[in-house]
Structures are given as structure tokens and as C-alpha cells.
Amino acid sequence: MASDRQNLQDAFLNHVRKTKVPVTIFLINGVKLQGVITWFDNFCVLLRRDGQSQLVYKHAISTIMPAQPISLYEGEDAN
């Protein structure tokens, strides 16, 4: 069933959240935010840095770039 499958956005955000990979978030107005994603839902992302949390609305996000390469694929051919 299609509803049982996780979409790419959720898989990506969940992976960087669980592994605590630092990310850089670029907003559509050009602002650059850096930190660790601690929580997310359909509408927003909670970003933590230096003990402070920022609630960032997804509609304002242009790009999320992890600080290191990540692999979402867990099959035999994963590199």
C-alpha cells in the first residue's frame, strides 16, 4: 500500500535527526542557518545550535545540506 511507504523528505529528515548530522539550511530569502535537526513534522523543522532551538517553517526552506555524505539506501549495493 502506498501509504505505508515513507517519502524521501521524511526519510532524509529522519536520518539526519537520528544520526545527529549537522545541517545547513538555506532559506528562500538567502539566510543560512546551521545546527542539528531535533524534530520535524509536515509544516516545520526544529533546529538546535549552541543550546538554542529555532522553529523553521518548511515553506521558508530552499535547501537542506548535511555536513557529511549520507546514505538513505540500506540494500546490498549501498556505498
UniProtKB/Swiss-Prot annotation:
SUPFAM superfamilies: Sm-like ribonucleoproteins (SSF50182). Pfam families: Hfq. It comes from Ruegeria pomeroyi (strain ATCC 700808 / DSM 15171 / DSS-3). Belongs to the Hfq family. It comes from the Bacteria. InterPro entries: Hfq, LSM_dom_sf, Sm. Homohexamer. GO terms for cellular component: cytosol. NCBIfam families: Hfq, PRK00395.1. The keyword RNA-binding applies. Residues 10-70 form the Sm domain. The keyword RNA-binding applies. This is RNA-binding protein Hfq. HAMAP family: Hfq. One of its GO terms (molecular function) is RNA binding.
